[in-house]
Swiss-Prot record:
Disulfide bonds: none annotated. The keyword Protease applies. InterPro entries: Peptidase_C15 (IPR000816), Peptidase_C15-like (IPR016125), Peptidase_C15-like_sf (IPR036440), PGP-I_bact-type (IPR029762), PGPEP1_Cys_AS (IPR033694), PGPEP1_Glu_AS (IPR033693). PROSITE patterns: PYRASE_CYS (PS01334), PYRASE_GLU (PS01333). Belongs to the peptidase C15 family. This is Pyrrolidone-carboxylate peptidase. It catalyses: Release of an N-terminal pyroglutamyl group from a polypeptide, the second amino acid generally not being Pro. Homotetramer. It is found in: Cytoplasm. Gene3D superfamilies: Peptidase C15, pyroglutamyl peptidase I-like. GO terms for cellular component: cytosol.
Length: 214
């Protein structure tokens, strides 16, 4: 049976929970599309997050790796297109590290593109009645760090797809951030299940507009 590795993060930035792990942990040992899903939590720490991720990939030999992170303020499920080779932290990570303009991988490419069928995933999530879009930036904090490091590792591995999805706050978090959008955990879970199945069985992405003007 094929394996899908899905990851979420521990809380950071003063939050008591991280919606990515709250939802991703529910998928551990699930069977989706005939494949076993394994969930792992990543520390919100530069360097350490990639060490944990790389160890999980080496141990599990997954067919798909989907990293998930919190994007407070976003209104929908956002499937990331690209990760860039820079750490530029506006706030410290959970170990107090705050790199500024430091490469994720020294001498690595300027960017890596997701190898997931991102537009097909967005389309399938929308068809499930859940708001979703392609995102053009994963930021420059630990989420981008993980996405870049993941894709850099997978570039030397045959037949393994990988990428990143950002999700909004959960309602209980938004209650502490008046005006902030949120999405229920059950809805996020359905979106991630849909994304996983699409990633498993769509090899060539669909050609539809998913860009941004700014």
């Amino acid at each position: 049976m094929k394996t899908v590795l899905i990851t979420g993060f521990e809380p950071f930035g003063g939050e008591q929970i991280n919606p990515s792990w709250e939802v991703v942990s529910q998928l551990d040992n699930a069977i989706l599309g005939g494949c076993r899903v394994v969930a792992r939590q990543l520390p919100c720490v530069f360097g350490e997050s990639l060490a944990v991720l790389n160890s999980a990939i080496d141990a599990l030999s997954p067919s798909v790796v989907l990293a998930v992170g919190q994007a407070g303020g976003r209104t929908d499920i956002t499937v990331e297109r690209v990760a860039i080779n820079v750490d530029d932290a506006r706030i410290p990570d959970n170990r107090g590290n705050q790199p500024v303009d430091v490469p994720v991988i020294p001498n690595g490419p300027a960017a890596w593109f997701s190898t997931l069928p991102i537009k097909a995933m967005v389309s399938a999530i929308r068809e499930a009645g859940i708001p979703a879009s392609v995102s053009q930036t994963a930021g420059t904090f630990v989420c981008n760090h993980v996405m870049y490091g993941l894709l850099h590792k997978l570039s030397s591995m045959a037949d393994v797809k990988g990428g990143f999805i950002h999700i909004p706050y959960l309602p209980q978090q938004a209650a502490a951030h008046p005006g902030a959008p949120s999405m229920a955990a059950d809805t996020v879970r359905r979106a991630l299940e849909t994304a996983i199945i699409t990633a498993l069985y769509v090899d060539a992405d669909i050609i539809v507009a998913g860009g941004a003007t700014h």
